[in-house]
Amino acid sequence: MGARRATYWAVLDTLVVGYALLPVLWIFSLSLKPTSTVKDGKLIPSTVTFDNYRGIFRGDLFSSALINSIGIGLITTVIAVVLGAMAAYAVARLEFPGKRLLIGAALLITMFPSISLVTPLFNIERAIGLFDTWPGLILPYITFALPLAIYTLSAFFREIPWDLEKAAKMDGATPGQAFRKVIVPLAAPGLVTAAILVFIFAWNDLLLALSLTATKAAITAPVAIANFTGSSQFEEPTGSIAAGAIVITIPIIVFVLIFQRRIVAGLTSGAVKG
């Protein structure tokens, strides 16, 4: 019975992984095909070419967009995780007036669909000079990413024994020192998980980046891919779009592979009570 169940789950896992990987493999295949064979319907290219990859880097638009995506994503991640860690610590450890209000406000932010806020954000940023700038994207990204960071980290902070923090305070540490030198190192898996999730959110966003930017000064990689055009009005830039999609997927895959164990530890924190 045990062997049959193991075989069943192995087959099911294989099917799920195959289902998830098939679109990625198809996009990768498209990125290696010349324009003449893009629509041949074959997964394995009959002719392999790297012209699509060379083409997207031929101009400076995609390179600038990649730099913008990396910079905006990293700054958003650092600020959101730092603020989220402090807020999550307060939610998990402290009792203070307005605690429920803070949690409710975080929930309220997640309830709003981003598209309903595009027009107000556009008008506000045009009025104060933040349109088509890094801060013009970083600020709304932080706003939408903070609830995610708070919920991820608060669950992890609740699992850290109180005794460790009390022992640090008995040794003369201030609450701030106990947080920085005891709680934060122990919460490293949760911090890494929150950082990865926030970075993925900022890296993959298209709606806000498309609405709040206009030039290569601030457009991100997803926007650059959406703006790809063929060499003529009769040519579809399918291969270029596929190549760009593969390029912007690589950093996420690398991050997840490097921090896989910490991500799993962070996401499963609080699932089992010891």
Swiss-Prot record:
Pfam families attached to this UniProt entry: BPD_transp_1
Superkingdom as given in the UniProt entry: Bacteria
Statement: the UniProt record of this protein carries the keyword Iron: no
GO cellular component: plasma membrane
Membrane topology: Multi-pass membrane protein
Physiological role: Part of the ABC transporter complex LpqY-SugA-SugB-SugC, which is highly specific for uptake of trehalose. Involved in the recycling of extracellular trehalose released from trehalose-containing molecules synthesized by M.tuberculosis. Trehalose uptake is essential for virulence. Probably responsible for the translocation of the substrate across the membrane.
Name of the protein in its database record: Trehalose transport system permease protein SugB
Organism: Mycobacterium tuberculosis (strain ATCC 25618 / H37Rv)
Record lineage: Bacteria, Bacillati, Actinomycetota, Actinomycetes, Mycobacteriales
